[in-house]
Structures are given as structure tokens and as C-alpha cells.
């Protein structure tokens, strides 16, 4: 004997989602939360720009739950540039994105601390490069960042 089952509206919606799944990651907006460029020895320091500056970069990732499945992910950059033992520049940037996530709970942390930073990094790098150039400094290209290694190091640090 055949049995017929009638699907509830909720089951039909869920079945429809299998054919038309929601994207796992949706970036709602990206924005500059904080941006600061200081050139303490300007304009005299520009005469000393005969060689590439020594640049130190510190990068951090932070994620906060906003509500439901919405999160704010921030990349924080602190950069110091020195030339001939003088401070050339100090740049700080916090670049953020508001994202909606449709991922299983066990994948949430890696997505927030690895995948979203990978997505927004090129935009943050562009802001930094443009800021330095507009500040009268030579362009500086930040190499890609290994967010997987950062995540693993973060997990090991108590």
C-alpha cells in the first residue's frame, strides 16, 4: 500500500531552500571604522626619502555578533615606517564588514576569523596604499596575510 504524506508549509519552505540555498556568506557592508595617518617629521622627512622605509606591520582580527546571524568583522592594522632612524609615518586602520552567515555552528569561528578577513583584506590594503600615497609617501604594498596561521596561533594562545 502506498502512503501519501502532505508537507507542511514549513517543510515546503525548507525543501525549497535545498533547491535555492541561501548563500553561506553575504557581505552587507564594508566600512572604515578608524583611519589615522601621522607624519611627525613632515615636511623635512620627505628630503630623506632616498631609500625604501623599514615598515613594521601588526594585524589583528576581531569578530562580534550583532544579532541573529549578523556579525561585524574587523581587521586592525598598526603600521610604523622608519627611515634613517627617524619615524616616517604611523598609520592605523580599522576596516570592518557587516556580514550575514548561514553556516553550521562548528564552522562559525573559522569563517569569521579566516574567510571574512580574506574577503575584506584587499579592500583594506587598498585603503592603506591610497592613504600613504595621498600623504605624500611612496606606495607600500602589504603582502597577503596568512589568516589560517593567525587563527591557529590565536587558538594556541591562552
Predicted regions and their residues:
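N-terminal intrinsically disordered, cationic/polar leader segments
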Residues: 5-119, 123-158
